[in-house]
Amino acid sequence: MAKPAARPRKKVKKTVVDGIAHIHASFNNTIVTITDRQGNALSWATSGGSGFRGSRKSTPFAAQIAAERAGQAALEYGLKNLDVNVKGPGPGRESAVRALNACGYKIASITDVTPIPHNGCRPPKKRRV
């Protein structure tokens, strides 16, 4: 016997007041993820996903647009306060933080969580152009 069609349940949006913005700024791209305090992702955006391709992905403006998109998507959860974790040496570090501030979030702290080796792996060879 066929099961009756299950009614689609309304997805309940949880309200989160405090969150963490993780900004991963590499030399090629910038990834902005906004999570709650437990680390569950609320929204994310990248420079490449925001319409930038090639060398334009690694610009501060592309990072700014990615941070704005992630910030606007996370506003639906009622987010007010953010702690910002910045990782990586990329050019979009500062502009992404400024864009989140412009979205209306109260930024409590900015932390640099870039992993620093204690003389671990050998770095890539220097470029010869």
Curated annotation (Swiss-Prot):
**One Pfam family matching this protein:** Ribosomal_S11
Molecular-function GO terms, alphabetical: rRNA binding; structural constituent of ribosome
May I have one GO cellular component term? ribonucleoprotein complex
Chloroplast keyword on record: no
**Annotated keywords:** Ribonucleoprotein, Ribosomal protein, RNA-binding, rRNA-binding
- Membership in a protein family: Belongs to the universal ribosomal protein uS11 family.
Entry's HAMAP family?
A: Ribosomal_uS11
Q: So what does this one do?
A: Located on the platform of the 30S subunit, it bridges several disparate RNA helices of the 16S rRNA. Forms part of the Shine-Dalgarno cleft in the 70S ribosome.
- Self-association or partners: how does it assemble? Part of the 30S ribosomal subunit. Interacts with proteins S7 and S18. Binds to IF-3.
UniProt protein name: Small ribosomal subunit protein uS11
Source species: Stutzerimonas stutzeri (strain A1501)
